[in-house]
Amino acid sequence: NPNFINLCLNENLSSEITLQPLKRFDLDAAIIFSDILMLPYGLNQKVEFEKGFGPKLGEVNIEEMSKLDEIDFVQKIHPVYKAIKKVSSSNIVKNKNKNTIGFVGAPWTLLVYIINQQSPKKNLKENFFKNDFLINRILLILEKFLKIHIKNQIDNGADVIQIFDSWAGLLEEKDLPNYIY
């Protein structure tokens, strides 16, 4: 759905989608309806979802990304935090003593999407690993904004944050200490 990001940015719909399973089943927690690619979106990279293909990201503008400040980033994805607050303060979560789970993509996995501009299972760019300077520069930006994103999720009611590192398996063992942390 090309409007998936818009759905994630609709605090009313995303909180309702999050709460639906708790209304039907006796689950331990509410997992926020969102996507790990909200972070690249917050960094002003175009993010769309194509039916039958998956995520497609626009060209990365490293200069724009490095100049982005915390206020602009948080403002762009603020509806995600409002949805977390809505879920964590909902009667079903509070009255049934349920936890609220937020999540992020790990730096490496986000880097793969940002540079590759799509899922690596579709195609991994041939020169992906050749620009260490670019990789390390983006990782530093991701570290900064992941901390902000995690803190905002917790400040708005997430009890725990799950970190997804979906593409760690692309690395050779010797590279793990450099990129998985």
Where are these regions (language model features)?
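Generic, ordered loop/turn and secondary-structure boundary motif
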Residues: 5-9, 48-50, 58, 66-69, ...
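Noncatalytic linker/hinge segments flanking ATPase motor cores
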Residues: 17-27, 69-80, 141-145
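N-terminal basic, low-complexity leaders that serve as flexible interaction/assembly modules and, when applicable
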Residues: 1-45, 49, 89, 93-95, ...
